[in-house]
Regions:
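NAD(P)+-binding Rossmann beta1-loop-alpha1 motif at the extreme N-terminus of oxidoreductases
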Residues: 1-54, 60-62, 113, 124-128, ...
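Residues that mark the start of a beta-strand
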Residues: 2-3, 102, 330
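Short beta-strand/turn micro-motifs composed of small residues
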Residues: 8, 31, 105-107, 143, ...
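Rossmann-like NAD(P)(H) cofactor-binding subdomain of soluble oxidoreductases
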Residues: 61-155, 172
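Internal alpha-helical scaffold of NAD(P)-dependent oxidoreductase catalytic cores
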Residues: 96, 131-138, 156-253
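General beta-strand structural signal in soluble alpha/beta enzymes
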Residues: 105, 137-143, 183-187, 255, ...
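NAD(P)-dependent Rossmann-like dehydrogenase/reductase catalytic/cofactor-binding core
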Residues: 199, 204-214, 223, 230-241, ...
Length: 381
């Protein structure tokens, strides 16, 4: 039995307590300063309000002020915060980690330097830990298609554990692997993490299609708009492969679980797709974001960071002006709040051509209360 401390009681970190508990491990779930009500619910009833289900009896809940007790004797630590809280989590871990611990990050995104250089989030997390201690910690991450509600419901889920030490990955896989939680390993740490960030960008773009159909007044038409979706999905896969080469990852990682697998499930629904639909229907990004109540959007954040780095990388000659045409277009829409325009003629390695076809203008489509209140646990992260 291993003692595992999970920092952050959001839906994914909490869902991962299920396979761990099923394997008989001592699981300690610690809330952040934003999770007070979640932990209170778990302590009182065992029910996670986001997942809307009871966690295994062996999972123990701790408020943030109890974090030292939760980390006592832990051998594995899971950083369960999202990309917006990575540096905060690193600062907490800096005082809690001990030499020899294994740390797994689940946040998906990247960080850009002033010159446009991009870094994966586990490296950002580790930066907050003093160098001497950092070198005595093993770092890993989880990629692949994984909806939290399905993990908690023990539905078959296939994921990739990535890191630089194969022996550590083997130990982690054995710790987590169950009959329903299937774990593969990869030493392409950078590649898996780049895919984890970029899949959110392209999943958002796939959401445009349904909105475009609504703008055309053909939502009920027998002729759908899957061709549009598939083209953006395919270009997203191409650009993920290009980014892996640029960052030193293995291009083939883009075409497995961590890349197209994760992008597929994220494109199936959720917040990224909902905001994409509203943009496709005629709203600007800021209008769509406001319509959805300014909810956290990891896809939009990733587009702003990664897409925003491209002009600087282009100026330095690191990438060509014709590279990443879809991501550049997404940055115009999300980062600069410009009208939707898809550069069809510049995609799939084609020579750049003058302006492609923009979707026709029309009024925005309303969002129902049911959509706004969609259960976060049962949509892709």
């Amino acid at each position: 039995m291993t003692t595992i401390a999970i920092l952050g009681s959001g839906i994914m970190g909490s869902a991962l307590s299920v396979p761990l508990a099923d394997n008989g491990h001592d699981v300690r779930l610690v809330g952040t300063f934003l999770d007070t009500e979640i932990i209170a619910s778990l302590k009182a009833t065992g029910i996670h309000p986001g997942l809307r289900r009871k966690l295994p009896e062996s999972v123990r809940a701790y408020q943030l002020e109890e974090v030292e007790a939760a980390f006592e004797g832990a051998g594995i630590v899971l950083s369960g915060v999202n990309s917006f809280g990575v540096r905060w989590a690193g600062q907490q871990l800096a005082r809690l980690l001990k030499p020899g611990m294994l740390v797994i990050a689940i946040a998906k995104g990247m960080e850009a330097a002033e010159n446009g250089d991009l870094r994966i989030l586990p490296e950002v997390l580790a930066d907050e830990v003093p160098e001497e201690l950092r070198s005595q910690i093993s770092w890993a991450a989880i990629g692949g298609p994984s909806i939290a509600g399905e993990v908690a419901a023990r539905r078959d889920t296939c994921v990739v554990f990535a890191g630089r030490d194969q022996a550590v990955l083997d130990r982690l896989a054995e710790t987590f692997r169950t009959d329903h939680y299937h774990v593969w390993t990869s030493t392409d740490f950078v590649g898996v993490e780049v895919c984890a960030a970029m899949k959110n960008c392209y999943a958002l773009s796939v959401g445009f299609a349904e909105g475009v159909l609504e703008r055309l007044g053909e939502s009920d038409s027998i002729d759908r708009i899957h061709n549009y979706e598939a083209a953006l999905f395919g270009q997203g896969a191409v650009e993920m492969g290009q980014m892996l080469r640029l960052q030193g990852g293995r291009p083939e990682t883009a075409y497995g679980l961590a890349g197209v697998g994760d992008m597929y499930v994220t494109s199936a629904g959720g917040r990224n797709v909902r905001v994409g639909r509203l943009i496709g229907a005629g709203m600007t990004f800021l209008e769509a974001h406001a319509k959805l109540g300014h909810i956290t959007l990891e896809g939009a954040a990733a587009i702003k960071v990664i897409g925003g780095a491209l002009p600087k990388l282009t100026e330095r000659g690191v990438v060509e002006p014709t590279d990443f045409p879809l991501l550049r277009a997404l940055y115009e829409v999300i980062g600069k709040d410009q009208p939707l325009h898809i550069p069809w003629g510049s995609m799939f390695g084609a020579e750049p051509v003058p302006a492609g076809t923009a979707a026709p203008e029309a009024g925005p489509v309303p969002v129902s209360e049911d959509e706004r209140a969609a259960e976060l646990a049962h949509e892709p992260d």
